[in-house]
Amino acid sequence: RFFCFFMNDMKINDLIFKELLKRGYSLSGSTRIWNIADSKLWYLTTEQAQAYLDLEKAKDYSKQMFDVEIDLLSKFMPEISERVLNGSAVNIIDIGCGDGKKAVVPIEILSKMTKVRYCPIDISSYMVTEAIRKISKLNKGEVVNFRWNISDFDNLENVSSLLRDKEFRQNFLLFLGSTVSNFEIHEVMYEVVEAMSRGEDYLLLGVALSNKKASELIKSYKTKLTDDFLSLILLQLCFKKDEIEMGVRYENSRIEVYYEIKKDKNFSL
């Protein structure tokens, strides 16, 4: 199945349309594939962002993606804190912050040892707002609210340098929730490392590993909540729900969610 792009009177999300045109497609046999695994198009609207937060709350998804990570943070953050802190106050930069819950444990533990300043970073303004609201309620230190909160990895180096000052010399970067798995790992890690100061900054990377069978992993993703979240990308291209079909597979050493387009579609700008 493939997209056909023509002009008519249908209204679509032009950002998604242009991004798909810019990226182009790859071929698998006679099938054209548009890769949007990097998540740039996942949270463009409030509806998309909230649909993801709803998915996070699902029991199976939360257990697989977040519960174990939070348990590990609770167990090891005291030891990590002792290794990380170098005497200065610390900026906690939360990359792909979501609603901020992944940063709660690090903030609570670090704030007992030094002065902390929290800076959420996400491509979704809705996520940033939710993270600022959640972390502000902890009352554990300053929460940075400025234009660079809404950023991708291209701006990370600017953010880290803007936050560094005489009091807050050190940046502690959080990259949790297996967010790194949504990107080409070498490219994204290059951007992260470039934003760090050697000998001063630290990165805490969270990646989900599992010894479950592929069939078990697939089952936890093949849900209505997953479909409700990811289908919003195609619905903004004026597809109807019955014109697309979600599939889940285990390939390239990871779970992949994809959509088959059941018929050609005309698009307009």
Predicted features by range, described:
Residues F2-I93, G100-N149, E157, L162-F168:
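Rossmann-like AdoMet
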Residues K101-A103, M127, S181-F183, N211-S215:
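Short catalytic/ligand-binding loop motif for oxyanion handling, primarily in non-cytosolic enzymes
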Residues I121, V180-S181:
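Conserved catalytic-core segments centered on acid/base and nucleophilic motifs
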Residues F153:
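Hydrophobic pocket-lining residues within nucleotide cofactor-binding pockets
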Residues L174-F175:
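A conserved beta-strand element that flanks and buttresses the S-adenosyl-L-methionine
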Residues S181-E194:
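A short, conserved alpha-helix within the catalytic core of class I
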Residues G199-K212:
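Conserved beta-strand signature within the Rossmann-like core of class I S-adenosyl-L-methionine
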Residues S210-L269:
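SAM-dependent methyltransferase
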